[in-house]
């Protein structure tokens, strides 16, 4: 059999992306969330905030964290005050996630903070921070990809995919997300 692989060098696709220590930390977190939070009634937001803080999350006041959301690494999550992480939201945040005040992640939204370089023979793992400024709304089932910066007041419509930065006080929709229209900046007119 003829092969182009270097037998002495193990296949890059089979190498782990994370250390055993990291995997054990995330396993501990997942089990604790399952036992302490996943089953809790929706109104117990403060309890879930407390548990997240015990695992290193930096959270502002009056956050609404729903029990069936999935946060990959709470120690890489930072929020300001009055942030909503809704039902079914998934934060895959190996590069970190920052959520500005009054930002909302609606049901089943997905923030994906990592990918792989598919052009590399090493299939290199790439992680990027996702940032949402204040008053950003990520609508139901929308996806935000690695490294995307959502500027103040931007909206990503339902089931849309943001692969590029979102401009301030603008509405985006589609896959890939495209600018639709301006959002009324209620901060200037209140």
Question: Can you name each region flagged by the protein language model?
Answer:
Residues 1-57, 61, 135, 153, ...:
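Terminal amphipathic alpha-helical/low-complexity segments used for targeting or macromolecular assembly
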Residues 39-49, 68-80, 84-149, 175-176, ...:
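Flexible, glycine/small-residue-enriched loop-and-beta-strand segment within the central core
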Residues 60, 149, 167:
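Short conserved AdoMet
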Residues 63-66:
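Short alpha-helical DNA-recognition segment
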Residues 84, 137, 155, 161, ...:
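Short-chain dehydrogenase/reductase
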Residues 97, 160, 168-170, 178:
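Glycine-centered loop/turn positions within well-structured domains
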Residues 140-164:
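Beta-rich strand-turn-strand
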């Amino acid at each position: 059999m003829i092969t182009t692989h270097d037998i002495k060098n193990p296949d890059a696709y089979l190498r782990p992306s994370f250390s055993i220590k990291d995997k054990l930390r995330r396993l501990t977190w997942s089990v604790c969330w399952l036992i302490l939070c996943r089953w809790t009634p929706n109104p117990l937001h403060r309890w879930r905030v407390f548990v997240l803080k015990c695992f290193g999350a930096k959270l502002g006041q009056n956050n609404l964290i729903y029990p069936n959301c999935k946060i990959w690494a709470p120690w890489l999550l930072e929020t300001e005050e009055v942030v909503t992480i809704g039902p079914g939201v998934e934060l895959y945040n190996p590069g970190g996630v920052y959520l500005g005040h009054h930002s909302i992640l609606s049901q089943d939204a997905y923030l994906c903070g990592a990918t792989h370089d598919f052009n590399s023979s090493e299939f290199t793992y790439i992680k990027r921070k996702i940032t949402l400024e204040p008053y950003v709304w990520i609508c139901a089932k929308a996806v935000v990809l690695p490294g995307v910066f959502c500027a103040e007041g931007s909206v990503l419509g339902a089931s849309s995919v943001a692969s590029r930065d979102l401009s301030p006080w603008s509405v985006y929709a589609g896959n890939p997300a495209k600018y639709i229209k301006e959002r009324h900046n209620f901060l200037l007119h209140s």
